[in-house]
């Protein structure tokens, strides 16, 4: 409800808080015990001439009772006969270039699945194994460490695997936000466990950093937390400079997450794509992920034309795509909190739109706040915005971008400072 502003305007922030409280009452703010991890957005299809097994050690946010792995397929055809093994670990090797290749007590659980073709252009199918009767075990290498799983995924010869489009550099070592180490070997490492011997996460060619199948992991937790679904273009996917799918949204989630109050994310963002496509990615998977928080970018620079700026047709598409998001959530019976990042500037040297940049500023200031079904992340654009050129186009602040459009590491940190309070507020409401 709206509160009558009869008192001095100095009380406006207080009334704003009351109105926001009323808006989120009844939404999915009490959290969930089913979390789904998907670290990478856009995928590429990688042909395999020989049978190949992908091995990985992955950290989850909190203790779990059971789990299931989802294997993505971005190929235009089905991939039958994929074999999956999963187990648990109590540690990871001290050296970040190594991975374990066997679980605790050599206890593997094995599954075989057939992967249907992709759901559409740039939209992978995700096929889940049955629920694995595996519970997490305590870490022995670090005190109070998060739980670790191990997996193997075996693809048959002459099949196609789906891998992170931009690889997964910086997901191990001192800069890694969570443990993710992968290795691979051209053997049938699920069929014959002993055949897989590759413990090296790095190789000059086709090493674990650039040649990996990373599964989706859905796990049922003891602690209650929030499930975030991130949807947008490259900025939301989290790329720019050295960043590989770990941008402001992802950082906000993992920096706030604790084993006692976990936050997990499903990265459904797709770089180089627009709202018409990435809103469909959300529609493809939202019923399985069942997020309690959705971050959705209604505006994408990929729909903005150099010189003329955003067209009337593109504006209609982005509004219709936002409508698709709400239709999808309603059809799935979901009422997550939806957060809208504002549209960010682009340097003139990257895409010159001149005075037409006013359309973006008007979108942020006037149109987006009218969408009552979500909350605008206020200050998101300002966190990146520097000066304005003579033609009227805002520029990204010096030092916050390397290419004039994507935030670099410092740029994502600047955005993160604006995003985190929204997640923290919702995390505080977990029942």
Residue ranges and their predicted role:
Residues 343-431:
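Catalytic His-Asp segment of secreted/periplasmic serine-dependent ester chemistry enzymes
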Residues 264-268, 337, 377-378:
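General small-molecule cofactor/ligand-binding pocket signal
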Residues 1-23, 283-288, 320-335, 365, ...:
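Viral virion structural and adsorption modules
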Residues 4-7, 11-231, 236-237, 241, ...:
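N-terminal secretory targeting modules
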Residues 170-178, 308-328:
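A short, gly/pro- and small-residue-rich
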Residues 297-302, 326-362:
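Active-site segments of SGNH/GDSL-like serine hydrolases
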Residues 71, 116, 124, 132, ...:
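Conserved SGNH/GDSL esterase-like catalytic core that processes O-acyl groups on lipids
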Residues 146-151, 227-228, 291-295, 333-338, ...:
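Hydrophobic beta-strand segments of well-ordered beta-sheets in folded domains
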